[in-house]
Amino acid sequence: MTILANIEIRPTGPDNEFRAAQLLYTTAMPMFEFLYGPDRDFMFNMLAWQWQAEESLFSHRLALGAYDCDGHLIGLELGCDNRAEAAAFAGTHAVIRARATAEQQAHLSRSAPQLTYLTPHTPDGNYCVHNLAVDPHAGVKGLGRRLLRGAFEHAAKADYRAVCLDVLDNIQPLVSICTWAWIWPARCACPA
C-alpha cells in the first residue's frame, strides 16, 4: 500500500491522457455517458484529446495531479475561475470540430445543451473545482483530501475569495471529503 507521504502532488502535463480520461470519467459517469452517447471509445478519446489540448474544459493546464512513486497518475483536481471557463469552452468546441465525425458532432450538439444546468456559473473572484478524482485501487488514504487542500492552497495564492465545488452528490467519497472540509452542499432541483 502506498502512503500519502510518498505521493507527489504537482501540476500536470499533456501526457497520461488515457489515465486522465479514466479518472475524469469517474467524476460524472452518467453525464459523460449521456453527453457522448453509447460509443465509449469516442467518449474516452474525447476526454483524452481534451486533456492534451492547451485549452478545453478538461485540459491538463487546469489540473493538479497526484503521482505515485512510479510516476503513475492516480488522482487529479481540475478547476478554474469564470474567466478561464470561456476559453475552456471554446477549446472544447475546437477539439470537437477537429476530432469528432459529423454524426458525433450532431449528437453532441443535441446532448450538450441539455447539460448546461450541471455547470453552474462560477462567481467572480472564486475558484471552482469541477473534477476531483482518485483511483480507489491505488489505496492511498486521504488522497482526495490532499488534492482538495491543493485547490484551496492554489486559490489562496491567487487571491480568490472562495472555492466552489462542482460535483455530483452520488459519489460517496466526495460527500465524505466535503463533510471533512466543512463544505455544505447546495441543492438544486431540476425540472423533469
Task: Map each language-model feature to its residues.
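Conserved acetyl-CoA-binding loop-helix of GNAT-fold acetyltransferases
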Residues: V140-E153, C178-T179
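Conserved catalytic-core motifs of GNAT/GCN5-like acyltransferases
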Residues: C164-D166, C178, I183-A192
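Conserved beta-strand in the GNAT
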Residues: G65, H72-D81, C128, A133
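Conserved acyl-donor/pantetheine-binding loop and adjacent beta-alpha core of acyl/acetyltransferases
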Residues: R83-N126
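Conserved GNAT acetyl-CoA-binding A-motif
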Residues: G125-Y127, A155-L168
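Active-site rim helix/loop that mediates acceptor-substrate recognition in acyltransferases
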Residues: R40-A63, D68-C69, T116-L118
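A short beta-loop-alpha structural element at the N-terminal edge
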Residues: E8-Q22, M31-F34, N82
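Conserved GNAT-fold acetyl-CoA-binding loop/helix
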Residues: A28-W51, T92, I96-T101
